[in-house]
Amino acid sequence: SSDLISNYDPTNKPLFLKVSFARPHSPYDPPQRYLDMYEDALIPDPAIGDWCGKYAKKLNPEKTAQDAPYGNFGNEYARNSRRHYYANITFIDEQIGRIIQTLKEKDMYNDALIVFVSDHGDMMGDHYHWRKTYPYEGSTHVPYIVKWPSANHVTPGKTDAPVELR
């Protein structure tokens, strides 16, 4: 994306660029330098509701399907999964930063409309659930960030209310 922007002639016609990242889907395999950033991080244990008894039996992650949608694999496994997930998010954040920096270098940033959105989150062991298949906050509370062109005078804001694309 950065190479395309660097070589783009903005006087020709407007540029539409859709950038998609395969991460942070499982398996959580971030580049090592990003994982190293979280080596000593205090990673929280998953939230476990007292109603989760049917999933509470501890399972061995080595003997369970890699993409199991639920299971108690223990807090250490959950923290390590989160460490890898956070490292993937940091990797993505850096890549987005590279794209924004390139837009600025090409003097295209102020005219750019940038929309950052994710299709889902991940349960990361909360309530012994994994992946994206549940209507809990971990699956549904995702970023939706819009940076308007500077010519549009849009009042900045933030909401925790549900939003949608139309």
Task: Identify the residue ranges that each predicted region occupies.
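Active-site-proximal cap/lid insertion segments
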Residues: S2-L165
